[in-house]
Amino acid sequence: MGLLDYQTIKQDFPLLQTKMNGRSLVFLDSAASSQKPRRVIDTFANYYRCRNANIHRGAYRLSYEATDLYDQTREKIARFLKARSPVECVFTRNTTESINIVARSWGEANIQAGDEIVISELEHHSNLVPWMMLAERKGAVLKH
């Protein structure tokens, strides 16, 4: 695979066509909220217009269709990530929620008093705080 042309990729992201103070927008807060390519925006808009229904619990056609789309998406993601099973892929709202789930589940089960939790000094606040709180609860040491 050759180098990616960032200008071509940038064209797929509508918000990145915005000018701020007369200059092209550069968005560097993707840990908090990543920008979406046009294809994702269009796919979600179509889903909400035509397919939005409860998944895995409705007993009507639209719910069955939404469930099928959800399950197919999970299977595609599992293949892309080379997961052993689609059930290994968990959907969350965002990175913040995901890292909190990891810290509150894996961290609670595995971190013990005196253990060292090592993170980068460059971490986003949403990745720093869950580990700080876990270290405090467990008597572990947070290093960065």
Q: What are the residue ranges of the model-derived segments?
A:
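Pyridoxal 5′-phosphate
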Residues: 1-144
